[in-house]
Amino acid sequence: MPKMKTKKSLAKRVTVKSNGTLKRAKAYRSHRATGKTTKQKRQLSKATIISKVDMKNLKGLLQ
């Protein structure tokens, strides 16, 4: 049976941390930010951890 290929689109969007969790960037930050407050923009600039529910499906795509 051949090896599973890594989904490159996902691999470019997430990073795997040392404990195995996946880290991603938040959306709604790239443009049209004038209507957002400074607090919103600051919080959107930080990375976040992918939930455990989604992690199971996404780890299979990164194999």
Swiss-Prot record:
Annotated segments matching region Disordered: 24-44
Transmembrane segments: none
Protein keywords: Ribonucleoprotein, Ribosomal protein
InterPro entries named in the record: Ribosomal_bL35 (IPR001706), Ribosomal_bL35-like (IPR021137), Ribosomal_bL35_CS (IPR018265), Ribosomal_bL35_sf (IPR037229)
Entries under Gene3D superfamilies matching the protein: 4.10.410.60
The keyword Transmembrane helix belongs to this UniProt entry's keyword annotation: no
UniProt cross-references to NCBIfam families, sorted A to Z: rpmI_bact
Signal peptide (residue range): none
One of the GO BP terms on file: translation
SUPFAM superfamilies according to UniProt: L35p-like
GO CC, alphabetical: cytosolic large ribosomal subunit
Family: Belongs to the bacterial ribosomal protein bL35 family.
GO MF terms held by the record: structural constituent of ribosome
Protein name stated in the entry: Large ribosomal subunit protein bL35
Recorded superkingdom: Bacteria
